[in-house]
Amino acid sequence: MGFFDKLKSTAVNTVSSSVSSAARQMTDKARHGVQDAVNSAVKSVGTKRESFKFSSLPQSLEELQALPEASLDTPYKTAALAVLALCAYTANREAGTEMLNWLRGPRPMNGQDVSFLNDRFRDGKTYLPFTYFSGSTPDNGYTPTQPYTLVIQSDHTSNDEAGYMKLFIPCGGADAPRPIKLRQRGSDGKWFLWEQYLLTGVQLPKEQDPWA
């Protein structure tokens, strides 16, 4: 091969290599761009916030069932009523139990469930369910603003399990919202309380905190 042929071959190879490298870079950027878009879409799917306002808190199952949210046709409504039922339980265990059992549908509480609730509310911790109302803070002893307002929210993991919905409720005594899980009944589409993680520890009310 002559000198000029070698020079030509080298030039062609160099150009080809540069073009291939540029093409790979463009492909990588495109791939990353698509992946970023997919990740963003996944994160946004199912993200929703619903707010519920109550002029007063129900003291009996009949009062709970009289609320519009008692249709139980969305998991958000059932989650909101679960907080109200827990509040009622702190004042009247019998009434609160009736409410919770109704919200649980075909799976009423057993002895272990009742023992768990009683244990959570020991030592003056009856304020726990009230920490989920807007305006409740450690400084004001978790006293909600009026009307009683609850925010229920979902995220991209909420409907990972078919027939269930995991929602989250912001808490005035914790940095992150607390989860609650609902299950849908196939026969009528209504949503019922399945699991709740709303009674875990929160920051002590100021009047109970010796270090405040």
Model-derived features with residue positions:
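Glycine- and small hydrophobic-rich membrane-insertion segments that are intrinsically disordered
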Residues: 2-51
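Short beta-strand edge/turn micro-motifs at domain boundaries
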Residues: 170-211
